[in-house]
Amino acid sequence: PKLTQEQAEIILNKYYGVVNFIWLEGVAGLEITDMHIDGFAKFANKNSLVTMSENDLLEWQVPANDIIKLYNSKNAEGQNYKIVTLPLTQNEVTTEYGKKLGYKGSYCNYYIANNVVLVPNYNDANDAIANATIQSLYPNRKVIGIDVRNLYANGGMIHCVTLQQPK
């Protein structure tokens, strides 16, 4: 929090080799997750960025300037990312116990494990579309849809509640 963007970039470059950065403004204090990036964007590989359509991002309350930055972002080689879009749920999410949450669900918050990809599902018609799209990105892993409606009521999804440990 006390670092400038330039100082952060120097450290990230030194320890992780990052050469290109995508700085988004976000919306601090926004309900649900304060605009955590894992709810609306994920790198599938070095050339592909998984996100939502511009309209869905606006509905998700992502600032318009951040959408432009995301859609125009470049990878480490300076090439534009191939944008792969996942839908929001068709309907606002209702928990298994009937609580209406008043907002739609994102599929971007999936978790990539060694042999599987765990995808948030919401008992919604778009679950199948999201699962198939994600399966096409990870052909050597099995996509498993996990019903997250009750978890989502507390502001989290699969990626939020897992603790990744890279090999």
Tell where the protein language model's regions lie, with residue ranges:
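Histidine/cysteine-enriched polar flanking segments
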Residues: 1-167
